[in-house]
C-alpha cells in the first residue's frame, strides 16, 4: 500500500517536472524569437536616438561574415601614450616607453602595411589627422603599400587634442571639421568614416559627425550586425567594433601576447561563421582594431599572418575593408 502511494507520488512529480521544463523551454523560445523584433525600433543606449538593424542576408559570393582589420595610425607625442613598462613611466626621459612608441611608428606601421600587401588582403586605416605632417616619410612609405585602404578619421591626435566633450555640439562639429580638413590636406582623401580618438565619444559625437558629412562610425561596440542611427543631422551607419577584439587593451592591460590574440581572433570569427552557416541567420560583420605596438613587432606580425591565412581558408568569411562593406549593403558614401 505504502509502496503504491510512493510510486504514484513520484509519477505525479515527474509529470509536474516535465510540464515545468516544457513551459520553460517555450518561454526561452519566445524570448529568442522576440529578440530581433524587439531590436527593430530600439533606442540607442548612448544617444537615446532611434537605431535599427540593417538586414544583410549575405555578403558578395555568398560570404556570411565580413571581417575588417582597422590599423590605428596615431600620434601620441613625446611623454604621452601607452606604457609598456608602467614602472618606468615616471623617469625623465622614459627611454623604455618612448622606444616602445617610436618603434611602433617607424617599424611597426610599415611592417603591417607589408603584411597586408603580401597577403593581397584589404586593410582599413584609422588616421590621426596630425600623423601625415608629423611623420611624412612613414606615411608615404605605408600608403604606397596599401594605396586603396579607406581612411577613417580618428581625431587630431590621441593624447592632447581629443574631442572637446562637454563643450557642446558646435565645439565637436568644429573639431571634426578641422580633423577632416587636415586629413584631406595630408592625404588627398576626404574621410567619410569616424572612430573617436582614445575611444572616447559622447552622445553629441554621433550627431556632430553626421553633421560634418560622416556617413559611418566605428563608435558602436555592442553588436554583430550593422545598424543605422537616426541622428538629428541625418542617418549614421554603425559598423560593429567589439571592444573584446581590440588588441591593445588585451596586450597592455591583460598581459596577452600576440599569440593569445591570434587564438582570440580566430575563435571569434570562426564562431561567427558557425552561427552564420544557418541559412535563416543574417550576415554579420566585425571591425577588428589592430595597433602597431602589438601586431607591428616581428612576433605580432607573425601571429597576424597566421590569422589572415586561416581566415582566407574559411568558406563563409570575407576579409575586406569598411568601404566594401558599405558598397555591398548599398550604402555608398
Spell out what each predicted region is.
Residues 22-33:
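Bacterial N-terminal signal peptides
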Residues 42-148, 307-310, 316:
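Active-site beta->alpha N-cap acidic-glycine motif
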Residues 91-93, 110-113, 118-202, 234-235, ...:
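Metal-dependent polysaccharide deacetylase catalytic core of the NodB/CE4 family, i.e.
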Residues 167-174, 256-260, 299, 303:
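Alpha-helix N-cap and loop-to-helix initiation/capping positions
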Amino acid at each position: 500500500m505504502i509502496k503504491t502511494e510512493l510510486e504514484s507520488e513520484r509519477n505525479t512529480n515527474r509529470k509536474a517536472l516535465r510540464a515545468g521544463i516544457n513551459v520553460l523551454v517555450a518561454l526561452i523560445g519566445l524570448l529568442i524569437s522576440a529578440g530581433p523584433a524587439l531590436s527593430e525600433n530600439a533606442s540607442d543606449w548612448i544617444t537615446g536616438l532611434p537605431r535599427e538593424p540593417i538586414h544583410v542576408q549575405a555578403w558578395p559570393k555568398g560570404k556570411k561574415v565580413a571581417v575588417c582589420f582597422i590599423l590605428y595610425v596615431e600620434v601620441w607625442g613625446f611623454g604621452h601614450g601607452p606604457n609598456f613598462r608602467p614602472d618606468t613611466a615616471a623617469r625623465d626621459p622614459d627611454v623604455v616607453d618612448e622606444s616602445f612608441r617610436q618603434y611602433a611608428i617607424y617599424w611597426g606601421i610599415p611592417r603591417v602595411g607589408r603584411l597586408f600587401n603580401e597577403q593581397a588582403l584589404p586593410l582599413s586605416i584609422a588616421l590621426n589627422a596630425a600623423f601625415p605632417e608629423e611623420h611624412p616619410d612613414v606615411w608615404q612609405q605605408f600608403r604606397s603599400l596599401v594605396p586603396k585602404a579607406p581612411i577613417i578619421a580618428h581625431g587630431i591626435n590621441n593624447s592632447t587634442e581629443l574631442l572637446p566633450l562637454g563643450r557642446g555640439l558646435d565645439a565637436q562639429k568644429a573639431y571634426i571639421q578641422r580633423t577632416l580638413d587636415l586629413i584631406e590636406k595630408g592625404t588627398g582623401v576626404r574621410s567619410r568614416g569616424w572612430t573617436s580618438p582614445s575611444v572616447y565619444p559622447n552622445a553629441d559625437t554621433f550627431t556632430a559627425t553626421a553633421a560634418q558629412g560622416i556617413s559611418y562610425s566605428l563608435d558602436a561596440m555592442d553588436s554583430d550586425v550593422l545598424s543605422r542611427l537616426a541622428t538629428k543631422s541625418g542617418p549614421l551607419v554603425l559598423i560593429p567594433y567589439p571592444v573584446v577584439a581590440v588588441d591593445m587593451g588585451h596586450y597592455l592591460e591583460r598581459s596577452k601576447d600576440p599569440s593569445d590574440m591570434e587564438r582570440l581572433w580566430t575563435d571569434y570569427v570562426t564562431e561567427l561563421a558557425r552561427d552564420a552557416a544557418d541559412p535563416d541567420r543574417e550576415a554579420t560583420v566585425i571591425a577588428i582594431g589592430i595597433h602597431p605596438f602589438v601586431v607591428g613587432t616581428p612576433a605580432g606580425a607573425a601571429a597576424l599572418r597566421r590569422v589572415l591565412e586561416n581566415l582566407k581558408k574559411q568558406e563563409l568569411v570575407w576579409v575586406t575593408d569598411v568601404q566594401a562593406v558599405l558598397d555591398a549593403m548599398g550604402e555608398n558614401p
